[in-house]
Structures are given as C-alpha cells and as structure tokens.
Amino acid sequence: MQSLLCVRQYVKDGNEKEKALAAKIDELWHGMEFDWYRNGDQNVLYWHWSPNYGWEMNFPLEGYNECLITYILAASSPTHSVPAACYHEGWARSGGIKSASKPYGYPLELKHNGAEEKGGPLFWAHYSYIGLDPRNLTDQYANYWNVVRNHAMSDYQYCVTNPKGYKGYGPDCWGLTAVSYTHLTLPTNSR
C-alpha cells in the first residue's frame, strides 16, 4: 500500500488515465480495514486472517522487523485507523522493543525479532522505508535513521569480519537479507 500511495501522489494531477488510477488507489486505501486486523479490540495487529482457518495462525506483528510500515499505515488510515495504544502495546511491546545491544560498536536501539544481539537481515531495514523516509523519524523508542544506519553498518562490519568464513563476504560483498533457502547457485554458493 505504501508504494501505491506514492504512485497516487505522482499521478493524481496527470492525464485522465493517471487520474483514474489515482482514484482506484484512493478507493483501495480507504477500503483497507486495518482496524479489523486487531482481531477484536486487541492492541496489536495480526499478520493475517484466512477464510479457512480464521485467526488460527495467531501471529502478532511486533517490532522490530519489516512490519513498521503496517503500523504507520494503520495509524494514518483515513477510514480504518487504529489507536496509538495499538502501536505502543503491539509494535513496541509496551517498551520491550528497546535494545542496548551494540554489535561491532553500533547501537541497534531496537530489538530485532529473532536476532536481538546482532540485528536481523537488512530486509527489515529496507521494507518499511520504501516510501517512508526514516530521516528525522523518531519516537520514544528510537531515532529510526540511526536504527537504519547502525543496522547497515553492523551488517557491513559482520561481512568484513566474516566470523564464519563464508565465501565472498567482505568489504565489497555485504548487505545480507532474508531468503527462504540456503543454497544459491548463482553467482557462487553462499550462506
């Protein structure tokens, strides 16, 4: 949705086809029921609902990971917004999101889900910021520009240090991201 909103802003004053596209995007934006993903009135958003399984997956979106943008969009929805408590209790885990970890001397500021000590894949630092500029974005938990910068710097330093001796890691090959497999065939095998 964040990318569509960027497109909408770009084409809204364009030709008739572009204006029609902007109107469709706006209709979709107004129709997104972010508040429904609270699974009742819980102060957290849930990953998904299925017509076959309902809320069975029971996967709350808690930070820090790529889901920050979901809370930003949900809070700013013109029709189906969520209360601030949803962000603070859900995303920020009632303050439990804060971290004192400093991999390679770079403060993470936030606990990266599943990678609290050293930070997670850079996908987490990129996805929410496709259409959201982290510069000057702060709240009581973090300065998000620092979060993104320090995450990238610690990732870079990890690859330069290469503590596990992975082939190719180094100052010219870094930027680890999330994948669902461990065997790559091109250009070379890596982990």
Question: Which residue ranges define each predicted feature?
Answer:
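Ser/Thr/Asn(+Pro)-rich, low-complexity disordered segments
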Residues: 1-184, 191
